[in-house]
Swiss-Prot record:
GO annotation, cellular component aspect: plasma membrane
Function: Transfers the gamma-phosphate of ATP to the 4'-position of a tetraacyldisaccharide 1-phosphate intermediate (termed DS-1-P) to form tetraacyldisaccharide 1,4'-bis-phosphate (lipid IVA).
Pathway named in the protein's UniProt entry: Glycolipid biosynthesis; lipid IV(A) biosynthesis; lipid IV(A) from (3R)-3-hydroxytetradecanoyl-[acyl-carrier-protein] and UDP-N-acetyl-alpha-D-glucosamine: step 6/6
Keyword ATP-binding belongs to the record: yes
HAMAP family: LpxK
GO terms (BP aspect): lipid A biosynthetic process; lipopolysaccharide core region biosynthetic process
UniProt superkingdom: Bacteria
Alphabetical list of InterPro entries matching this protein: LpxK, P-loop_NTPase
Lineage: Bacteria, Pseudomonadati, Chlorobiota, Chlorobiia, Chlorobiales
Family recorded in the similarity comment: Belongs to the LpxK family.
Annotated source species: Chlorobium phaeobacteroides (strain DSM 266 / SMG 266 / 2430)
GO molecular function: ATP binding; tetraacyldisaccharide 4'-kinase activity
Record key words, sorted: ATP-binding, Kinase, Lipid A biosynthesis, Lipid biosynthesis, Lipid metabolism, Nucleotide-binding, Transferase
Protein name: Tetraacyldisaccharide 4'-kinase
Gene that this sequence comes from: lpxK
Catalyzed reaction equations: a lipid A disaccharide + ATP = a lipid IVA + ADP + H(+)
Length: 355
């Protein structure tokens, strides 16, 4: 989230933002601003930068881990990009009740991929948790997972996880709006666990790991592993899911926080990226944009490939329904792949629910 404005404007704006965040955090630290304690255990997964850290795949992994233990998790998200306001029930743990335009693309993806999880969107995480307590009083979830909540200090958490993208030079970064930092790096001291994501395993990984270890917080490392390629001939038809076949010539498109990581993942699977189109994170697609992508793919005999998040975003846009009926497109499923610290993560997650 950096802005294309002169440095003479951005630098003072970043300094002002930094001071506002510093004052706000100090008010919480001194308990002038009060933190609410939920009767249900809370796990927060957030970041210290604006988008593209690999947070959503980690949220998905944690939800699936709790489900594998026989737990009933609830996911609380802001629902970025949604056209609704207030507290909304996305899934009751049995049925997904909303499309992505009403709850946000990432939230819709999490709900559909974890049908047994309760999913709520709300601007204020506390409002969402109190809604869960009232709405599911007779069958409470075992744990609530706050998506993107590191900066939301109004609600206390039992475990605070911060995800950091190795590819972002955070230790030389500026605050929003000049840079991508949401708050100063010193505030990583609030976290219980740091996850260094999208690692390459080279000298960059080692250097950033050393920097993070200076915080005194445990650090685990994870790359992004490609799953299957889901291809649809007409995006409302039954999906065909299969392993990625090397040699596919693709037109890749995405509207995510870190699109180059998507390209790197595709190329790592042997997919040849002949052309690509990037859009802003959470940007709505239009019929004109989709038609242009299809025309280019047809002319160059390329396969349209996008992210799972973009797929769900398109499905939720009413104005795209007609063109999507005939659009052939594939999306790549991804997951975190831990290279160091998976056992520690599970131990800390278990402790939250007294396992």
């Amino acid at each position: 989230m950096s802005f294309d404005l002169p440095d003479i404007i951005l630098r003072p704006a970043s300094l002002l933002y930094k001071n506002i965040i510093r004052i706000r955090n100090r008010l919480y630290d001194q308990q002038i601003f009060h933190t609410w304690h939920s009767p249900l255990p809370i796990v927060s997964i957030g970041n210290i930068s604006a988008g593209g850290t690999g947070k959503t795949p980690l949220v998905d992994w944690i939800v699936k881990y709790y489900l594998s233990l026989g737990c009933k998790p609830a996911i609380v998200s802001r629902g970025y990009g949604r056209n609704t306001k207030g507290v909304q029930l996305v899934s009751d743990g049995k049925t997904v009740l909303m499309k992505s335009n009403a709850c946000g693309d990432e939230t819709a993806m999490l709900a559909w991929n974890n049908r047994d999880a309760i999913v709520i969107v709300a601007e204020k995480r506390k409002d969402a948790v109190t809604f869960i307590i009232r709405r599911f009083a007779e069958a409470m979830p075992d744990v609530i997972i706050l998506d993107d909540a590191f900066q939301h200090r109004q609600i206390a958490r039992n475990l605070d996880i911060v995800v950091i993208n190795e590819k972002e030079p955070y230790f030389r970064a500026d605050m929003i709006p000049k840079g991508r930092l949401r708050e100063p790096l010193i505030n990583l001291a609030r976290a219980d666990l740091l996850v260094l994501s999208k690692i390459t395993g080279g000298s960059t990984t080692a250097a950033i790991s050393m920097d993070l270890e200076q915080t005194g917080k445990p650090v685990i490392k994870a790359g992004i592993a490609a799953g299957n390629l889901v291809c649809l001939s007409g995006m409302f038809n039954t999906a065909k899911e299969s392993p990625v076949h090397a040699g596919i010539k693709a037109l890749a498109f995405a509207g995510i926080g870190s699109p180059q990581s998507f390209i790197d993942t595709l190329e790592g699977q042997g997919i040849q990226i002949v052309s690509h189109r990037f859009f802003r994170d959470h940007e709505s697609y239009t019929a004109k944009k989709i038609a242009a992508l299809r025309l280019e793919a047809d002319e160059k005999k390329l396969t349209l490939v996008t992210t799972e998040k973009d797929y769900f975003r398109m499905l939720g846009q009413p104005e795209l329904q007609e063109i999507l009926h005939t659009l052939s497109c594939c999306y790549l499923k991804i997951r975190p792949e831990f290279t160091e610290g998976e056992k520690l993560l599970k131990t800390m997650l278990n402790a939250v629910i007294n396992r």
